[in-house]
Amino acid sequence: MVHIFTSILLGLLLLATGTRAQFQFFEQMFGGGQQQQQHDSREQNVPSDSDWYQRTYDNARCSNYLCPGTLACVAVPHHCPCQHPAVEDKFELGDGSAICVSKGGFKFGEAARKVELARKGLL
């Protein structure tokens, strides 16, 4: 009787150990390891809160106008540069403001023409 009980207990112990190892494998493959990867990439990325931007904005020295998108110091708001000048064209509107629009692969001046058509309600 003791021999049967010991055999059953040993069998359950081996089964539990094998099951645990199997679940650890699946956890590592489908989720557990992902948390570690996310943790590593979060250490390399800029935080998603606005504290860094707010500190940089507050510490910027500008006697004229500080552009909120680029933190450039310019004389008037419509002189602010585009955030991504390689892929954006700046278009100054007649009311003293300016917008940056995607070049979108258009030829030179095409973005400005489309903005003007949109302002007239033709696009």
UniProtKB/Swiss-Prot annotation:
InterPro entries noted in UniProt: LCL2 (IPR034543)
UniProtKB keywords: Signal
Keyword Cell membrane: no
Biological process according to GO: ERAD pathway
Signal peptide: 1-21
PANTHER family: LONG CHRONOLOGICAL LIFESPAN PROTEIN 2 (PTHR38425:SF1)
Job description of the protein: Probable component of the endoplasmic reticulum-associated degradation (ERAD) pathway.
Protein family per UniProt: Belongs to the LCL2 family.
Name of the molecule in the record: Long chronological lifespan protein 2
Organism: Ajellomyces capsulatus (strain G186AR / H82 / ATCC MYA-2454 / RMSCC 2432)
Gene name, Swiss-Prot/TrEMBL: LCL2
